[in-house]
A protein has these predicted regions:
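Active-site phosphate/pyrophosphate-handling residues
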Residues: 11, 42, 130
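Charged, amphipathic alpha-helical coiled-coil/dimerization segments
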Residues: 24, 74-137, 141
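N-terminal leader segment of winged-helix/HTH proteins
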Residues: 1-34
Length: 163
């Protein structure tokens, strides 16, 4: 494992942000041959897990605000990977479905994640990697408030833990 001091006086957020940006770069290079952006890749992964999600559900699944999510879906639709279908019970809502093109690329998309995960895993001992995964899993249980009027930060709360 690489030992180095943390930047910004050990600020968790700053250092985690830097680490995530570095991983984004690694992952971006891995998916570049697929012609996808990282957010498009996330959307496809979420749909491979459960096709036909409401657009708002899908936005939450990939950690985005529903209000700014539509352009991502537009681009994936233009590339031929998804299609929108109206919700029969709610005319304001749409379900997002994979196309046959997306199904043709399923293994490539899923394999790109496996390759990056394998590279990262090699950097750590098994015990360190298990600890890392536990921390990430815990951080994912925080319930963010994606509304524009959120007062969580002002009140000293970054989010509540789910489950």
């Amino acid at each position: 494992m690489v030992q180095s001091s943390l930047r910004f006086n050990g600020s968790v957020w700053c250092n985690l942000d830097i680490a995530l940006r570095n991983l984004d770069q690694l992952f971006g290079r891995a998916i570049q041959p697929l012609g996808l952006t990282i957010i498009e890749w996330y959307i496809l992964r979420a749909l491979y897990e459960r096709d036909g999600q409401h657009a708002s559900e899908l936005a939450r699944a990939v950690g985005r605000a529903a209000t700014s999510f539509t352009p991502n879906l537009d681009k994936l639709q233009q590339k031929g990977f998804i299609e929108r279908r109206p919700d029969p019970t709610d005319r304001r809502a749409v379900h997002i479905y994979l196309t046959s093109l997306a199904e043709q690329h399923r293994e490539e998309v899923l394999n790109s994640a496996r390759l990056v995960d394998q590279q990262i895993r090699k950097m750590f001992s098994d015990e360190e990697f298990e600890t890392f995964q536990s921390i990430v899993a815990y951080l994912q249980t925080l319930e963010p408030d994606y509304s524009e009027n959120s007062s969580d930060y002002k009140n000293g709360q970054l989010g509540e833990r789910r489950g």
